[in-house]
Regions:
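Active-site nucleophile elbow and catalytic-triad environment of alpha/beta-hydrolase enzymes
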Residues: 100-117, 123
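Gly/Ala-rich beta-loop-alpha elbow adjacent to hydrolase catalytic centers
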Residues: 30-34, 38
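Catalytic active-site module of serine/aspartate enzymes centered on a nucleophile-bearing elbow/loop
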Residues: 159-186
Length: 186
């Protein structure tokens, strides 16, 4: 069984609704692909705040999409996980043993809707971007900065790669997120 973008989005919606039933305000936070889900929720709900950490928000390059299609046509169903983009020595990211290509395809397809509606994000937004990210191009954060309709602040992470929550800037990142949320909820 393959999990799709619709499954992830439905699960995020359910979690948001469950939290909204218990909390007065809900902030959404996402790393990488989770950034797409954060945008998806913020585009559809009156979230209190958004935090994006090295988010995937825009359509992938055409050659990447075509390469994925070629692999699927050739019968390749999975690839090795995209993992380990961590600068800090000795830190290992826990991942699935492989990534199903059809699931990645549904994520790629969903990116058009996410990218096209970035301007509908009106919540206060914090964007944390690693200067040296080998997984998600910085154009994703640039697009959010250019199109987000709400107040937005970008903080650069100078000593981390893609998985910044486990990297050298993790404590700084945590402090920035907590300070931002304290200001929003003050």
């Amino acid at each position: 069984m393959t999990t799709t973008w619709d499954d992830w989005a439905t699960s995020a919606e359910a979690a948001y609704e469950e939290l909204l039933g218990r909390c007065e305000n809900v902030a959404v936070v996402g790393l990488s692909m989770g950034g797409a889900l954060t945008a998806y929720l913020a585009q559809r709900h009156d979230v209190a705040a958004c935090v994006f950490i090295n988010p995937q928000l825009i359509r992938p390059a055409k050659d990447l999409v075509e390469g994925l299609a070629a692999l699927l046509e050739a019968g390749v169903t999975t690839i090795d996980p995209i993992a380990g983009d961590i600068k800090k020595e000795g830190v290992v990211e826990t991942t699935y043993p492989s990534m199903p290509l059809s699931s990645i395809g549904t994520l790629f397809a969903a990116m058009a809707g996410v990218e096209d509606h970035l301007s509908s994000i009106t919540a206060p937004t914090l964007l944390l971007s690693s200067r040296d990210d080998h997984v998600v191009p910085s154009e994703n954060g640039d697009a959010l900065m250019a199109h987000c309709a709400g107040p937005i602040q970008r903080v650069w992470l100078e000593n981390s790669y893609h998985v910044a929550t486990l990297d050298n800037d993790a404590a700084f990142l945590e402090s920035e997120v907590l300070s931002f949320l304290e200001r929003v909820f003050a």
